[in-house]
């Protein structure tokens, strides 16, 4: 199964993609976005795609954005881009677990550092429901 950050093609959610463009054009895009829905709808894929768009410094509308084969995209595919922090409930062996407070503490440490090229810093937590009570409370204090 393809990981969300590896997926170059994206189909669906065109209404959401258009809304993201409209919010950005009207300078009303919040610093936090929450994608909600059933498993398998493409929420994480959309989040990684929008992250790629933002980190590539938005040279076009998101509705017409196509993922380019460049350094930023390759870093995202390898999950090593310093300005994109991905917190998941999957271990190396793909077993699900809760997201623990240590992961959120590590996130806080990473958020203190400067961004690469002065771009935005993006955090994707997938799924948010996997935060335990302590990690959720810690996240609220970021």
What is the predicted role of each segment?
Residues 112, 137-142:
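Conserved catalytic/switch belt of AAA+ P-loop NTPases
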Residues 2-134:
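Clamp-loader machinery-focused feature within the broader ASCE/P-loop NTPase space
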């Amino acid at each position: 199964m393809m990981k969300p950050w590896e997926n170059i093609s994206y189909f669906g959610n065109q209404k959401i993609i258009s809304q993201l463009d409209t919010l950005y054009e009207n300078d009303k895009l919040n610093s936090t976005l929450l994608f909600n829905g059933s498993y398998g709808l493409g929420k994480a894929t959309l989040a990684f795609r929008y992250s790629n768009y933002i980190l590539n410094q938005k040279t076009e509308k998101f509705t017409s954005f196509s993922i380019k084969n460049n350094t930023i995209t390759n870093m995202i595919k390898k999950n090593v881009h310093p300005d994109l922090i991905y917190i998941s409930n999957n271990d190396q062996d793909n077993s699900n677990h809760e997201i623990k407070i240590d992961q959120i503490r590590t996130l806080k440490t990473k958020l203190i550092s400067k961004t690469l090229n002065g771009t935005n810093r993006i955090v994707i937590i997938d799924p948010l429901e996997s935060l335990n009570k302590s990690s959720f409370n810690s996240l609220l204090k970021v």
